[in-house]
């Protein structure tokens, strides 16, 4: 991946600054104008698919089964992941699903930026994780020109972890790499990429440093990746 491609997690910005990419992620009027057409805040995240989305410190994840969240390796590797709790479908106005401590992490053994995070079932508020989230179903597949949406927490700390959804189109898929034009920002790492039926196609992991509204990248869930995830869902 070239210098204009950058990881979308706030935890990675220190590394990327040396590549001259970090400043390109914000304050681009032409990008913002495009984003206004296809980005909306989700103020009530208590219903599917929004209640399957969780916030990490500097990233996003999606619930796929009992106590089981899918996100990026670079989010899971964050030094803060065990210190900062996972917040289930936090939004600006809706009732959140609780804050949960991380139990363990399982990284995908291949090069793909994919990891499984297991959380403890009971939140600090005494809520049950599995009763307060929904599990996102996997899509059978996807192809170029399919419409998609991504849901997550762009610039989480700056926006006080408001949830946003953006829509776009798949440009192409090559193996486990998916390129699409849905707008994303730092904090969207690990955001679910959903089809028109709100089925899980993959997760976002990086984007273009020139114009995030034109080119972003996701880990496309091939049968092999889906098998890895399913084998690591808590029973």
Curated annotation (Swiss-Prot):
The keyword Signal applies. Its EC number is 3.4.21.-. Residues 1-35 form the signal peptide. Keywords: Hydrolase, Protease, Secreted, Serine protease, Signal. GO terms for molecular function: serine-type endopeptidase activity. Changing residue 92 to G: In strain: VBI-M0894. Changing residue 157 to S: In strain: VBI-M0894. Gene3D superfamilies: Trypsin-like serine proteases. One of its GO terms (cellular component) is extracellular region. One of its GO terms (biological process) is proteolysis. Coiled coil: none annotated. The keyword Signal applies. The active site is at 74 (charge relay system), 113 (charge relay system), 189 (charge relay system). PROSITE patterns: V8_HIS. It is found in: Secreted. InterPro entries: Peptidase_S1_PA, Peptidase_S1_PA_chymotrypsin, Peptidase_S1B, Peptidase_S1B_tx, Trypsin_dom, V8_his_AS. It comes from the Bacteria. PANTHER family: PROTEASE DO-LIKE 5, CHLOROPLASTIC, SERINE ENDOPROTEASE DEGS. Belongs to the peptidase S1B family. This is Serine protease SplA. It comes from Staphylococcus aureus. The lineage of its organism: Bacteria, Bacillati, Bacillota, Bacilli, Bacillales.
């Amino acid at each position: 991946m070239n210098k204009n491609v950058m990881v979308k997690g706030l935890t990675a910005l220190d590394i990327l600054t040396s590549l001259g990419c970090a400043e390109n992620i914000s304050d681009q009027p032409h990008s913002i104008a495009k984003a206004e057409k296809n980005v909306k805040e989700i103020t009530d995240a208590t219903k599917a698919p929004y209640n399957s989305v969780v916030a990490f410190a500097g990233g996003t994840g999606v619930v796929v089964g009992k106590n089981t969240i899918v996100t990026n390796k670079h989010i899971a590797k964050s030094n803060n992941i065990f210190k900062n709790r996972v917040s289930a479908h936090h939004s600006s106005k809706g009732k959140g699903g609780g804050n949960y401590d991380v139990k363990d992490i399982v990284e995908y053994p291949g090069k793909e930026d994919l990891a499984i995070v297991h959380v403890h079932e009971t939140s600090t508020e005494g809520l049950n994780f599995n009763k307060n989230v929904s599990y996102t179903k996997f899509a059978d597949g996807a192809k170029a020109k399919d419409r998609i949406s991504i849901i997550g927490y762009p610039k989480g700390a700056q926006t006080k972890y408001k949830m946003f959804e953006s829509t776009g189109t798949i440009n192409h898929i090559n193996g486990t790499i998916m390129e699409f034009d849905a707008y994303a920002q730092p904090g969207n790492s690990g955001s679910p990429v959903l089809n028109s039926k709100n089925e899980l196609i993959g997760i976002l992991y990086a984007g273009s440093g020139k114009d995030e509204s034109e080119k972003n990248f996701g880990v496309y869930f091939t049968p092999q990746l889906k098998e890895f995830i399913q084998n690591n869902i808590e029973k």
